């Protein structure tokens, strides 16, 4: 990988040399979506400072310089800041005046374009506006922009993810369908790679969701986990008796039953946690939010989960870069 750097006017200055960069990108509230970069003082161009860009063409890894620390004992200068994905966390989606929600309805890329319009000094652009064939219909109220985009796209008519790519001096965004790679990319010990697998403990399979009201007037919904992983009001005999595990969700301000159901499921799934897998690679084999499979032979842990975080560690000696990728699945 080759990383180009600029001045604060985004004019290219050259290729990073004699440096190391640690990136973490991924799902909102799972990944930090930031980076730390150390450069040999002798290789540092003083025009490369706060507000400058660095990036790898045709991929997501890059960011804007922010914090800076000089360590003369190590003969290095360290920069910290947000990745391009992390910059989306700097904004919140608020409802229009006089309305309870911002209603995101229509073709996905058009909606994304509307949400970022007038922000990020035109560094961010949206590709294929009106052309994705992905429809969204999602109500947003005071959500972090990255969080809102992830949730909106996941609930689209075609479950989707936000793709971020840097090229032509711009950060390009677009909605693309989530891909199930669990059969194609199914990792096990035979790969000869380092794996850490963790299976979640017994999960909640019943929700008591309480909304607005008092006593018998209070909104109350019982939801049951189904065999396909969805929730509805039909009891599932598979999770009866000792196998029943109930989560109580209490939101005394919610008067919309459909919103109560949605938020109670979200809270329960967060409380449940997910199966976890950490794998180390030297190449980038899959995209954020795609599904991959895992089987750990010693314990027999086996599951299919989304990639929710990527860590990239880059060491650049001269101009030769050595890369190590780590994937995390689950929350």
Question: Which stretches of residues belong to each language-model region?
Answer:
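Oligomerization/assembly interface segments of phage tail-like spikes and tubes
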Residues: 23-41, 75-87, 209, 269-284, ...
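Short beta-strand-centered interaction patches in the first periplasmic/extracellular domains
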Residues: 69-79, 83-88, 128-204, 208
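Surface-exposed cap/loop segments at beta↔alpha junctions
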Residues: 42, 47-125
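Short beta-strand and beta-hairpin "edge-sheet" elements
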Residues: 53-80, 163-164, 190, 295-324
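Solvent-exposed edge beta-strands and adjacent loop segments
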Residues: 1-28, 188-197
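Short polybasic amphipathic segments
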Residues: 1-8, 52, 172-173, 206-208, ...
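Acidic, small/polar-enriched beta strand-loop surface segments
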Residues: 179-317
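Extracytoplasmic/secreted envelope proteins and their assembly/folding machinery
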Residues: 109-113, 146-150, 206-207, 261-265
């Amino acid at each position: 990988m080759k990383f180009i750097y600029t001045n604060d006017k985004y004019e290219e200055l050259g290729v990073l040399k004699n440096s190391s960069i640690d990136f973490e990108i991924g799902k909102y509230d799972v990944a930090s979506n930031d980076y730390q970069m150390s450069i040999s003082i002798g290789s540092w161009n003083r025009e490369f400072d706060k507000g400058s860009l660095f990036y790898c063409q045709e991929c997501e890894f890059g960011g804007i310089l922010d914090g800076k620390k000089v360590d003369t004992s190590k003969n290095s200068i360290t920069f910290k800041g947000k990745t391009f994905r992390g910059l989306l966390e700097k904004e919140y989606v608020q409802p229009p005046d006089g309305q309870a929600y911002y209603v995101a309805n229509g073709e996905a890329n058009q909606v994304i374009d509307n949400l970022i319009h007038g922000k990020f000094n035109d560094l961010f652009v949206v590709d294929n506006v009106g052309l994705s064939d992905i429809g969204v219909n999602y109500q947003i109220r005071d959500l972090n922009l990255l969080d809102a985009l992830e949730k909106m796209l996941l609930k689209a008519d075609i479950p989707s993810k936000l793709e971020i790519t840097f090229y032509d001096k711009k950060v390009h965004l677009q909605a693309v369908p989530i891909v199930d790679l669990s059969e194609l990319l199914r990792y096990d010990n035979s790969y000869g790679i380092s794996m850490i697998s963790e299976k979640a403990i017994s999960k909640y399979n019943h929700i008591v969701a309480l909304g607005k009201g008092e006593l018998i007037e209070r909104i109350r919904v019982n939801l049951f986990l189904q065999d396909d992983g969805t929730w509805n009001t039909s009891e599932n005999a598979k999770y009866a008796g000792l196998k029943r595990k109930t989560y109580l969700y209490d939101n005394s301000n919610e008067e919309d039953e459909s919103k109560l159901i949605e938020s109670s499921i979200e809270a329960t799934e967060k409380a449940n946690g997910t199966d976890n897998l950490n794998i180390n690679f030297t190449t980038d084999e899959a995209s954020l939010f795609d599904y991959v499979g895992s089987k750990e032979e010693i314990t027999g842990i086996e599951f299919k989960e989304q990639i929710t975080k990527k860590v990239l560690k880059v060491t650049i000696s001269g101009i030769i870069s050595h890369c190590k990728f780590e994937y995390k699945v689950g929350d």
